Amino acid sequence: MAPYAPTDGISKLAIDQSKHFTEALKEALKSSADQQKVAAEKVSELVAGDANLNLGVVSQELRNALTGNDADAKVVAAHVVDDLMQKHAERVEAYLLPLLSVFLDLLGDKKPTVRPVAQEAALTIISSANKNSTIRILPILFDGLDRSKKWQTKKGALDLIAELSKVAPYQVGRCLPDIIPQVTDCMWDTRKEVKVAARDTMTKVCNVVGNMDIEPFIPALVSCLANPTEVPECTHKLASTTFVKTVEAPALAIMEPLLKRALAEGKTAVKRQAAVIIDNMCKLMDDPAEAQLFIPKLLPGLKKVIETQADPECREVATRAHETLFVAGGSMEVSEDELKVDYANIHKVVVESIAANPTAVKANIDSFVVDYVTGICYFLVVSRNFNKAVFEKEITTYIKAFMKPEEIKPLANEIRDRCFKENKSIFIEDVDCDEGIPDLCNCEFSLAYGGMILLNNARLRLKRGHRYGLCGPNGCGKSTLMRAISNGQLEGFPSRDELKTVFVEHNLQASEAELSVVDFILVDEDLKNTPRKEVEDTLAGVGFTAEMQAQGVGTLSGGWKMKLELARAMLQKADILLLDEPTNHLDVKNVAWLENYLTSLTNVTSIMVSHDSGFLDTVCTNIIHYETRKLKIYKGNLSKFVEQKPEAKAYYELESENVKFIFPEPGFLADIKNKGKPIIRLTNCSYQYPGTPKPSINNISVTCALSSRIAVLGPNGAGKSTLIKMLTGEVEPTSGQVWKHPSMRFAYVAQHAFHHIESHLDETANQYIQWRFQSGEDKELLAKETRKLSKEEKEHYKKPVNWEGEKRVLEEIVSRRKFKKSFEYELKWEKCPVDDNAWVPREKCEKWGWDKLLQIADDREAARANLQARPPTAIAVQKHLDCFGLGAEFGTHSRMRGLSGGQKVKVVLAAAMWLNPHILVLDEPTNYLDRDSLGALASAIKEFNGGVVMITHHNEFSSALTQETWNVEAGFLVIEGQQAEDKTKIEQKNEEEVTDAFGNVTKTKIKRKLTRKEKKAKDKARKEAEARGEYYSDSDEE
């Protein structure tokens, strides 16, 4: 038997049987302009009413009319196609779709009457055709974008692609890898109309991806395609986004052009960032077949970075991305040709399946339908749609004109079985939850933040009335997960209309600082209609007196601000309460109140992040734990969780094997022979804030030494932070004296630690530290009150002083040097040459009243000494950041805006320690750090050879580290447990290595102090050399 072949062309019999249609069409083509549409509708009705009419003849006759020279005939034929596709698309689309290319050419027709009807007919074909025929439509539209085509044709094709993205978004999404290059080329067209249309079309086709994470960046991505210079900035923007959806082929297709360009950028940082994004997006891809589509497109760029990039760290990241992409693609490296679905093979499957079915052979299915069905099957293969019902429905729609529906099913199954493989299923482990208690949510999602994959196909199931402790290491995404819930970014999580979710975090803004406490709550959009009495009663319930409710928000301490946030959340009557470090800034009494309040909420679910193990033990009914990018729920509180998972004992122990902080050695202090000798002293000091009726601090006297380990305790608002600010020089006492060693340096981490970096969030940690210390001085130190000169002080320093019998006016203090057991300072006088500079003892300068200027000079000299030993180069700064658990991924290559709260605190701590300080002052150091990091901090404090002063409500932390306690109550100080004087001898230590900006490492030579005998021999050698008339240098001895 001869092999089956579909009817190709039109037989003479078919033409004879269709003569009545041909005659009717010829008659319609002759109609006047005002009757053309009516005549076209009659022809359309004739086609619809004749089931035996050969539609191949219809297609051919319409093509002849559209390609002829008669403009009126073109208009009528276009109206016929438009009417048929609107009313009878299923029957005629296989025959009329090929005419789309003719309509594209007619968009540039010379006759103005032809162009609009051609546009209308083309739009109708696009909107009425089967959505799965998109893969057949697109090649026709791409042909219309060819450079040889008229600009009207190009613009029309672009408009049709945009329309296609509206009517068939899923199908367009699957075809994005083919669409984006074609439209991108048109963005560089010489014709303005084409460029504008291309940009608009690109935006619309990118929006079909339906990925809420990428949608905000689509304008930037589109702009990058037209302006490659924007690639670096766009890469940085995308690196700081939060991903909450599994990455599918359409999402990666949008990103691919940017990533390819970023990998080819000249800047190492951009290449590295692109590699990180590839690494993390591919980790979120579940289907290896989808990842394989991008292996031939992205792998070559990664290989080039690995082979040619000079920076070893960048090569390492690119290697990791290469491996992730390779694994995501099923550990197979395939070429682009191997991944293409062969249309000819699909056509062969359809033809052979028909040939194997006797009924189908007798049906004599024509080539128009075979080609159309092949196109639909081709798309189903490309999109890996394995649904039998869909497959059967699609084939039946077009073959039912030749066969009975019951005869088509075996044929459809045969075609389907030969085209598709079995779909792989993904097993998702469910979590252990209590049955019988209502679910608030049960959803599955993925989550990423910046350059890190946080969760992949994780399931979250929450029960009403349960209290969940969210546990995991710093940077794993605890706060990010809660923020994603609050912002409605999690797939399947109920909307805020169904489930009231309130996020309580440390983000109280100072812009409303003048509002009273009550008014601050009432301006909230969700609470503006709440009765004032209810607000006042709620505030009273958390401890706000009537007097406190009337005062400004800006006057509240950190603890009271957090209680205000909690009160606001209570008033919103949440179903789910999201608490980010709720015990931060709260004293013991208020922590107990919070525990009682949360446990009393039997109908409200709470999710909380806290590093206070006692709090989690008291409050939690369940623990949600991060495990290999999944969430696992354990029954019971923290102690029960640790019983089930012993490796989590770090939540109880203030020691860490996973994380280690290394504090730098304090700089050498002249005349300080042992660690117990005071290096700062406050005597009878008081401080009163402007406009307040009484002092915050009253008549205190304290000292600190290198051996000090001091805890500052007291209730919220007692004056602890004010005492610390006075100690560090952020404020000057209104009465009393402050003395400190001229070369002493402080490291100060404030209660609201982020204020140190809030104006630098678009920089990396490395860049921030380089900026802060690039001049050798700490730019934050320059902003302190003790460094600012008042008008009266400036006038005082301009008063003449008597020096060597002359009246002199100081211009500046230039430098400092050792003088006996003190210092002397080089003074530059006004209107005098440099040669007249004078070296004046410190005591003399103090007598003239220049204490503040001396302090400024001392700080500057101390900073300069550190700059010479350790210049703030990128390599040196990253080495320093490594000592605080912040690797290059987050320290050098990620902007601080994308870091977690704990990582930001590490940045602040590392920056504070850059100048090798002698005293470390920590205001609430346990805020935002996880247990591992707290353990690392505790170990570093124990090993630190400088003094430590800390404010903390974390009793476990302070009791393990301190021997002396300063109890502050209502502005008065009581000192307990003063430690014995440490007489440990101090030895000067120097940096063993210095790394310059080019990465060159220089070994430093440490000079040993000469013995008396060696000094005498050195003096004798010098005198002998001078007697011989020779120059003598110390280097001659080396």
From Swiss-Prot:
Pathway: Protein biosynthesis; polypeptide chain elongation. Its main location: cytoplasm. Residues 1012-1038 are annotated as: Disordered. It catalyses: ATP + H2O = ADP + phosphate + H(+). PROSITE patterns: ABC_TRANSPORTER_1 (PS00211), ABC_TRANSPORTER_2 (PS50893), HEAT_REPEAT (PS50077). GO terms for biological process: cytoplasmic translation. This is Elongation factor 3. It comes from Phytophthora infestans (strain T30-4). The gene is TEF3.
